[in-house]
Amino acid sequence: MQPIRLGLVGYGKIAQDQHVPAINANPAFTLVSVATQGKPCPGVENFQSLGELLENGPPVDAIAFCTPPQGRFALVQQALAAGKHVLVEKPPCATLGKAALWIKREQASAPCSPCIAYAPAIAAARDWLATRTLQSVQIDWKEDVRKWHPGQAWIWQPGLGVFDPGINALSIVTHLLPLPLFVESAELRVPSNCQSPIAASIKMSDPRLLDVRAEFDFDHGHDELWSIQIRCAEGTLRLDNGGALLSIDGVRQTVAEEGEYAAVYRHFQQLIGDKTSDVDVQPLRLVADSFFVGSRVSVEAFYD
């Protein structure tokens, strides 16, 4: 069977550190071209735009998008119109209205698959939680924007800020919990010179009134804190390192060694083979609702 010929749109830090290594490690894919206006990707043909890649590049079967959500919708639509399978980084696009069109496409078996929660410990955590009585959830997602997005002004555009990494936590939690979540209240702390929050406190619940709290911080310091703690009547489950580590009642559990992006591309391969889609907008809805109901608190200006 011939490998899936893949084009990549965007070649920033995440693409370089995560996507390209995962693609190269999966024999089901071969990276043949990249569209980037920055540094070129070595070993493949590089183009200035998706249109140029599709028109003048080698044939591709699928496109993976590693671009900011603003402006991504038109690019994804262009790839879908060209009949390409599509993999989209979370958040899939900038608004729920645009994402709704992809859900309709999913019903028509269009191949559109935003990344969801594929960190190594997630499957084991979900299995353990399936037979437990949930009591509360605490999310702490804190990192240094200067480390992960140095000089990237797009991160402060409306709808992003600390929610750019925070949606990763929401993707994991909504994947783990059996019922949909709803935002009850939020406090968004916005630097006086930015459009989006540098920190946020969010209170959520589900139809059974499960207490879910989240603390997001984009100015946390060099050492990241990416943890989710779920208290149950039968014990406490904790995920650390963004879902790479799993502990139950303080005891570290053995989990799969497969990395998140390796699992993402394995899932993408399966979707292409099955001619199906995986479109999940609940994390984006929670972000949108946080902006909708959240109080805005102005804090000191942020300088990179």
UniProtKB/Swiss-Prot annotation:
Top-level EC class: oxidoreductase
Subcellular locations according to the entry: Cytoplasm
Record-level Gene Ontology MF annotations: galactose 1-dehydrogenase activity; nucleotide binding
Keywords for the protein's UniProt record, in alphabetical order: Carbohydrate metabolism, Cytoplasm, Galactose metabolism, NAD, Oxidoreductase
Cellular component terms per the entry's GO annotation: cytoplasm
Record-level GO BP terms: galactose metabolic process
Claim: NAD is one of the keywords in the record: yes
Catalytic activity: D-galactose + NAD(+) = D-galactono-1,4-lactone + NADH + H(+)
Gene3D superfamilies (UniProt xref): Dihydrodipicolinate Reductase, domain 2 (3.30.360.10), NAD(P)-binding Rossmann-like Domain (3.40.50.720)
Highest taxon in the source lineage: Bacteria
Function of the protein: Catalyzes the dehydrogenation of D-galactose by either NAD(+) or NADP(+). Oxidizes following sugars in decreasing order: D-fucose > D-galactose > L-arabinose > 2-deoxy-D-galactose >> 4-deoxy-D-galactose > 2-deoxy-2-amino-D-galactose.
Similarity comment text for this entry: Belongs to the Gfo/Idh/MocA family.
Protein name: Galactose 1-dehydrogenase
Organism expressing this protein natively: Pseudomonas fluorescens
Phylogenetic classification of the source organism: Bacteria, Pseudomonadati, Pseudomonadota, Gammaproteobacteria, Pseudomonadales
